[in-house]
Amino acid sequence: GIDLGLKDLATLSTGEKIAHPRHYRRLEDSLGRAQRANKHRLARTIAARIGNSRRDFLHKASARIALAHDTIFVGDVASSSLARTRMAKSVLDAGWSMLRTQLSYKALRHGGMMVEVNERFTTQVCSSCGALPKVRPEGIADLGMREWTCCECGTVHVRDFDRVRSHVARE
């Protein structure tokens, strides 16, 4: 299973985290200067460099994941709705939909399959016992809560890994 995120691009059920290179954020200042100075050719070159590096990174990451796993579970994150929030630049810089597209065709090419899983309550439901405890991370306000303990079974959960385990358990 794979959990797509903003801090790390992806967290795998194996415990591996794929770092988020932040292609746009790295070149954002130089792109802005070129746009303000009306240097259209330079701005176009910088924008192409951002897109090419993001595409290259996602191709390499998706190929590595597709080769290593037969079945891939990915959450159905609605990046278009998150792109209208204050996290828009980070969401669009991550390239989640491009990664999902590449994972789906590369998994098929290598004899596997990719399944999109409903993400609803995956960070809130205990992946061990299935309980929905009263003390749990809820919504955008609790994004800072990275660990929580289930009141029912006492299991300590790290938010990203628990979400991945919930993806696999749902299917």
Where in the sequence are the language-model features?
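Positively charged, helix-rich recognition surfaces that bind polyanionic ligands
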Residues: 1-171
